[in-house]
Amino acid sequence: MSNFDIRTLAISKTGEVPVRNASGEKQYDADGKPLSITVHSPGTKAFNAAQHARQLRNSDRMVNKMQGKADGKQTAEDATEERAEFLTAITISFNNFGIDGQTGRAMFASVYGDLELGHIADDVEKFVGDRANFIRPSTSN
């Protein structure tokens, strides 16, 4: 029997996504604090539930499409809204920034649903799609 505990390879429960402009440059507030977004990792129940809800919507749409129902089609607006819903569900906080005085889920949905801020949603989706972004820091030297 090995002494290696495989759980030491588990990913963190959260990750911090740096906010970048459309050119890929990290952004900071007026005091020099970095803008970031804290998200649930793919190794959490919250992420799993959000992903499952997204997959159910897609499955329902496919069934409706196969049955010739009108609600089997996804518009561009639907796609944007559904992506915003998923990202909102996996977001814990926006750090050092906001929009229009909003807070919580309304703020998250507002940013993720704004096509002019689409690069932020793109970055968050890309970040959570790579489990390596959630690797725990090593405790050994």
Provide a role label for each language-model segment.
Residues 55-93, 97:
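Negatively charged, Asp/Glu-rich surface segments that serve as flexible interaction/assembly modules
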Residues 35-36, 66-74, 107-112:
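Charged, low-complexity surface segments at secondary-structure and domain boundaries
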Residues 5, 78-82, 130-135:
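Noncatalytic linker/hinge segments flanking ATPase motor cores
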Residues 1-65, 134-141:
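Short, charged/polar N-terminal "headpieces" of proteins
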